[in-house]
């Protein structure tokens, strides 16, 4: 995709890929991480594409390490099994991993199924409504603070949430809009509500204790942003709901 960052330090390479390969943690169902191309069957997404680009620049092999959801990816990183991922950069997560500067920002919203009477954000917080969130996600921690009357229902991942909609176990699902739009593509008649309940700031995450790599990582992010590589990756991933980095 682009030339290697000039004068890449061996210390940074060793810090980012200590096993001689870049182990990229990803989970299915979100174009932010990885989704399956309906035409080719190939797995791709922002995390996968940026991980491949960084591995290329480091001149090390790329290795995909798959999990079911972001909480498992971050647990794998904390355990030393993952070198690189892309995640919402929250203060809670920053206690366990190190983040680059913001890559992109994403709107947070709600998905409703076909024929839902819910038309706008003020309709969401009503007694009896069941709002799905991904187990271990930032949304799981935030939505209960925003909604006083609706019931929050954890789901293993986006695929399980779609199944829960089919069984009429959910009335809405809350997460970032790229994931919601990806889900809506698989649910005829489903809608992503207008407006947002928050914004996620997405950054590259690496394990704590690899400070020798942070300057290299900062330059990598800066270069993919200014060169157009990030824009290309966002378009290739089909990310919708992207707003200016905050």
Write out the residue ranges for each language-model feature:
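Extracytoplasmic small-molecule ligand-binding "clamshell" domains
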Residues: 2-88, 154, 227, 236
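A mature extracytoplasmic/lumenal domain signature
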Residues: 26-28, 66-69, 103, 114, ...
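Periplasmic-binding protein-like
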Residues: 28, 104-115, 177, 181-222, ...
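Solvent-exposed loop/turn segments at secondary-structure junctions
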Residues: 29-32, 70-72, 84, 89-94, ...
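Acidic, polar ligand-binding/catalytic clefts
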Residues: 48, 52, 56, 61-125, ...
């Amino acid at each position: 995709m682009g030339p290697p960052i000039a004068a890449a330090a061996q210390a940074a390479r060793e810090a980012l890929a200590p096993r001689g390969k870049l182990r990229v943690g990803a989970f299915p169902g979100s174009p932010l991480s990885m989704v399956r191309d309906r035409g080719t069957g190939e797995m791709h997404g922002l995390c996968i594409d940026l991980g491949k680009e960084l591995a290329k620049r480091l001149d090390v092999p790329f290795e995909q390490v798959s999990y079911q959801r972001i909480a498992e990816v971050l647990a794998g990183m904390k355990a030393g099994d993952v070198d690189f991922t892309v995640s919402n950069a929250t203060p809670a997560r920053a206690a366990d991993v190190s983040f680059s500067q913001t890559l992109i920002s994403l709107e947070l919203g709600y998905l409703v199924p076909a024929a839902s009477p819910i038309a706008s954000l003020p309709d969401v917080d009503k007694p009896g409504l069941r709002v799905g969130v991904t187990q271990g996600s930032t949304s799981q921690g935030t939505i209960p603070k925003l909604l006083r009357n609706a019931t929050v229902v954890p789901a293993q991942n986006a695929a399980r949430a779609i199944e829960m909609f089919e069984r009429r176990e959910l009335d809405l699902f809350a997460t970032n809009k790229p994931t919601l739009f990806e889900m809506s593509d698989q649910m005829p008649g489903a809608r992503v509500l207008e407006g947002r309940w928050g914004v996620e700031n997405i950054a590259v995450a690496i394990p704590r204790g690899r400070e020798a790599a942070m300057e290299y990582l900062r330059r990598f992010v800066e270069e993919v942003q200014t060169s157009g590589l990030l824009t290309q990756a966002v378009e290739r991933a089909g990310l919708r709901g992207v707003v200016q980095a905050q």
